[in-house]
Amino acid sequence: MPSSSKPLIIFSHGNSFPASTYGVLFQSLKARGFQVKAIEKFGHDPRYPVTSNWPHLVQQLADFTSQEVEKSGQPAFLVGHSLGGFLSLMCAARNPVLGSQAVRGVLLLDSPILGGWRATALNVAKRAQLVGSVSPGAISRRRKFQWQNRDEVLAHFRSKKAFARWDEQVLLDYIEHGTHDGTAPDQRLLSFDRDVETAIYNTLPDNLEALLKRHPLKCPAAFIGGCQSVEMKQVGMAMTQKVTKGRIMMLDGSHLFPMEKPEATAAAVEAALRNFC
């Protein structure tokens, strides 16, 4: 039986950031009248391993969404940041109906769609096993993963340029949910396995253009990007413009703008989703 008449958002996180990192964003969306459900960590369930082009992660999202749609009685909006945006797009393309309800729309948060020669180059790099030296996986595989306590974790991330602009509560949520106590005394560990993070980077989808030709989206799509996003500039926006039919909005911030400006992100997400209706 339906548990709520509120619109349902299935949110998918960015690589290495468990869904609980986005708690401030989720609370703001709930205050705006949405239900928000999310898989906590992609890539950590052995039933859905990380492989090239992420088919099992897409299936994990499809299975989770179907369950949540059936529980709530509401069709889902698929919203995702970075990795999560790509998974949302592929999931909606392959599964226009989830839980016996048509997907209402896809919203990409700084997930620019790779196509054309860049996708071909990525495919070549993957086949030649060179992708690990050119993707962010070159950094993630050496990422620091243990500290003595929470204060040391907080000091570590506060000193990082990528985290310097984060909302304070979001950073605290990341320390709380993105790390955990180890079995040894004085040990705080990264919760998102850096080997999984690296595997996700090294298996980036090079087939999005072909997938969307075989399975055209049956629902509207939109994109919200960060004005200072390096990732967006690297990938280009040609495919994104085509898929979203120009439904593009920009917010001040980097690729990680949902962590930097969670309240502004929630307002933009609401505007984009209401525009689908």
Roles of regions detected by a PLM:
Residues 101-146, 233:
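Flexible "cap/lid" loop of the alpha/beta hydrolase fold
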Residues 39, 249-254:
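Short glycine-rich catalytic loops that host catalytic nucleophiles or stabilize transition states
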Residues 169, 178-241:
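Conserved serine/cysteine hydrolase catalytic core
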Residues 38-79, 93-99, 113, 119-125, ...:
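Active-site loop/oxyanion-hole signature of alpha/beta-hydrolase fold enzymes
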Residues 80-84, 88:
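Gly/Ala-rich beta-loop-alpha elbow adjacent to hydrolase catalytic centers
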Residues 253-266:
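Catalytic histidine-centered segment of alpha/beta-hydrolase-like enzymes
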Residues 4-46:
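Conserved HGGG/HGGXW glycine-rich cap/lid loop of the alpha/beta-hydrolase fold
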Residues 10-14, 81, 225:
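The conserved beta1-alpha1 loop
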